[in-house]
């Protein structure tokens, strides 16, 4: 018998083949195309096919934002997911972004089980109902264990995870996998998390915080036949230590496929071979049935995105994202103004989240807002010391490195194993210089507020997004206990409201920071 396991991960609400930057696109990604590919494979197979979603399905696109914020319930979106034919799903970290009540409603509306063994409720039981699922195919039994990154409390608002306990995925797998080996012939672990170490060398590829435990699962938990991963948006397909592994990127660019050849020997099922690959949707057309059913809803979203929100004298268009991070930009300073006005603070931190951000032209639509400010962030004001703020700036300054020809470039720490443009922050309301010719941790100078040097013990109020305020991105100098007030309105709405309050925006650049290299010798970090 051949068992085929198909998997998606980190779809992030990209159902249609569009990034929503304009209408009527046909880009090489999206769940409608993945659905067509799944149907093709199922039609060609006579042996069993399992279809699994590995999490981060509920948030991430204008479609999911519209569903959550305008419709205020997930049922239209979950009815889309129900058309795909998933046999099971797993909770991802972004599932909590719109609150646990919204997540619970979504999970309840799905017609397939959503698994997670290592997120427990206040009774110590799996919070979403099931830890694992058993599938029977004639005389072959397959066990599927769902696991999620334990790092969610470091990113999420406390109200969204109240009453939940997050266990280590590895510790949880050590408990469950031996039991599942007794119940099943094949054990699959679907983990919404990635790899913390290089699969070949075992060298750490990131800070070992527990956010990603894929390498540890692979090497410290025996009995796993297939490990489906995600979260990092990487593209991985391999067989390592006799375990078939996939990670299919994000937004439905790729479909993970694992094929197992299983044979009965002396009354016992034996896996003879394992193959892992990623299938592209580049040549695949969108599922016409799903497209027809939900076209009216998609047009409703497109109309909402096209509504005019505000006007700008000139523009805030972004030509070179790297130059924005080196020298600032009117778009970034506009975001600072929105944050400072909403919170009454004079110091603000924000990021250019992605290199795909185009900024704003003279006429700003809702489409412009949600495709530039892509996360459903709320704002938090933190009270920190001068030492804390300097440490945060040093963390951001580590984004830069110098090439052998002494050109500024992005540090590999912010590019591998996952691009992290969103973890480089720019600040307004203070002045500072980043000198990249100095070692990491010693790059900040001329660090002033209102013209005066900021001292280590100075107390400052700073507005940043909620993700950063609780230490997200390994900004350990920030934490929930330093938050003194919060704005619970989504940042996208705050931007739209700012435009509505101000008839016409004039672009401005604060010119309050510089990135330089002052020394001739090159420091190797």
Please state what every model-predicted region is.
Residues 1-284, 326-332, 337-338, 348, ...:
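Acidic, metal/ion-coordinating pockets
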Residues 262-364, 470, 499-525:
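A short C-terminal boundary segment appended to hydrolase-like catalytic domains
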Residues 49-66, 191-202, 236, 241-244, ...:
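A broadly tuned preference for mixed-charge, low-complexity surface segments
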Residues 2, 14, 29, 110-117, ...:
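Feature captures C-terminal
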Residues 31, 74, 100, 287-294, ...:
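Alpha-helix initiation and N-capping motif
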Residues 5-12, 149-150, 300-314, 366-368, ...:
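Short, compositionally biased low-complexity segments
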């Amino acid at each position: 018998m051949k068992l085929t396991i198909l998997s998606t991960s980190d779809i992030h609400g990209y159902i249609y083949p569009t990034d929503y930057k304009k209408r009527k696109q046909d880009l090489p990604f999206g769940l409608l195309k993945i659905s067509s590919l799944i149907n093709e494979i199922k039609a060609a197979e006579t042996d069993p096919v399992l279809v699994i979603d590995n999490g981060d399905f509920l948030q991430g696109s204008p479609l999911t934002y519209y569903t959550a914020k305008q419709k205020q319930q997930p049922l239209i979106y979950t009815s889309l997911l129900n058309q795909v034919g998933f046999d099971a799903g797993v909770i991802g970290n972004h599932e909590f972004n719109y609150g646990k009540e919204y997540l619970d409603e979504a999970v309840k509306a799905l017609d397939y089980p959503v698994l997670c063994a290592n997120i427990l409720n206040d009774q110590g039981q799996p919070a979403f109902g099931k830890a694992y699922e058993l599938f029977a195919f004639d005389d072959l039994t397959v066990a599927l264990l769902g696991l999620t990154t334990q790092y969610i409390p470091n990113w999420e608002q406390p109200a969204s995870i109240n009453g939940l306990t997050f266990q280590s995925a590895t510790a949880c797998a050590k408990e469950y996998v031996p039991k599942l080996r007794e119940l099943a012939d094949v054990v699959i672990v679907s983990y919404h998390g990635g790899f913390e170490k290089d699969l070949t060398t075992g060298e750490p590829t990131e800070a070992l915080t527990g956010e990603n435990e894929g390498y540890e699962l692979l090497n410290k938990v025996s009995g796993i036949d297939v490990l489906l991963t995600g979260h990092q948006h990487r593209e991985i397909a391999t067989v390592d230590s006799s375990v078939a592994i996939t990670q299919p990127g994000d937004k439905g660019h790729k479909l993970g496929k694992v094929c197992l050849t299983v044979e009965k020997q002396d009354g016992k099922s034996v896996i003879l071979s394992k193959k892992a690959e990623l299938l592209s949707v580049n040549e695949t057309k969108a599922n016409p049935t799903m497209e027809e059913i939900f076209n009216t809803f998609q047009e409703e979203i497109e109309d909402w995105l096209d509504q005019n929100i505000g006007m700008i004298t000139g523009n805030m268009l972004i030509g070179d994202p790297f130059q924005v991070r080196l020298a600032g930009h009117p778009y970034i300073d506009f975001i600072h103004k929105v944050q400072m006005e909403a919170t009454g603070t004079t110091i603000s931190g924000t990021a250019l989240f992605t290199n795909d951000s185009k900024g704003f032209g003279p006429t700003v639509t809702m489409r412009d807002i949600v495709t530039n400010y892509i996360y459903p962030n709320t704002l938090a004001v933190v009270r920190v010391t001068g030492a804390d703020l300097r440490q945060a700036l040093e963390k951001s300054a580590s984004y830069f490195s110098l090439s052998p020809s002494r050109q500024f470039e992005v540090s590999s720490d912010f590019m591998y194993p996952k691009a992290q443009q969103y973890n480089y922050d720019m600040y307004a309301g203070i002045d500072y210089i980043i000198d990249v010719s100095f070692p990491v941790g010693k790059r900040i100078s001329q660090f002033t507020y209102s013209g005066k040097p900021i001292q280590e013990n100075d107390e400052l109020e700073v507005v940043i997004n909620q993700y950063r305020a609780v230490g997200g991105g390994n900004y350990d100098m920030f934490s929930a206990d330093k938050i003194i007030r919060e704005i619970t309105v989504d940042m996208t709405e705050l931007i739209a409201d700012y435009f509505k309050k101000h008839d016409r925006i004039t672009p401005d650049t604060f010119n309050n920071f510089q990135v330089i290299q002052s020394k001739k010798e090159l420091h190797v970090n």
